[in-house]
Amino acid sequence: MDIGIPVPNITLPATPEAIHKVPQAAEQLGFHSVWLGDHIVRPIGPDQPAYFKESSRYTWDLYEPMVSAGFVAANTTTIKIGFGVLVLPYRNPVVTAKAVASLDQLSNGRVILGVGSGYWPQEFQALNMPQRH
């Protein structure tokens, strides 16, 4: 069985230090993979997850997954680097394919690509895009 853990690029504690240290620790402990999430904005409204509520005392940054994955690749040597998931409608598909292929080559074949269609209306609104599903 292969076991992976999340990199906190969009969850607490989303900090450069955590994005640096969590994958290194996971690699040293023998985990198979680390996984990055993808969100553009935090949704606001009655249907948002509890941890995003405006009344929450917690705030954190949302680090871009491709950039974070490059950072992880540069600071590790063997652990697989997964996207769980990369939201394709937010990105140009040709540029995304090139970026993922480049990352996979630069990391010596360590990339696992998971893709999705997105589900938060606020993110599509922030990008001035229709939500087509």
Which stretches of residues belong to each language-model region?
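Acidic (Asp/Glu)-rich catalytic clusters
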Residues: 27-28, 70-78, 100, 104-111
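Conserved beta-strand positions in the central sheet of alpha/beta enzyme cores
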Residues: 35, 80-82, 114
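Flexible, glycine-rich active-site loops centered on histidine and acidic residues
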Residues: 2-15, 86-133
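N-terminal beta1-alpha1-beta2 module of alpha/beta enzyme domains
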Residues: 1-75
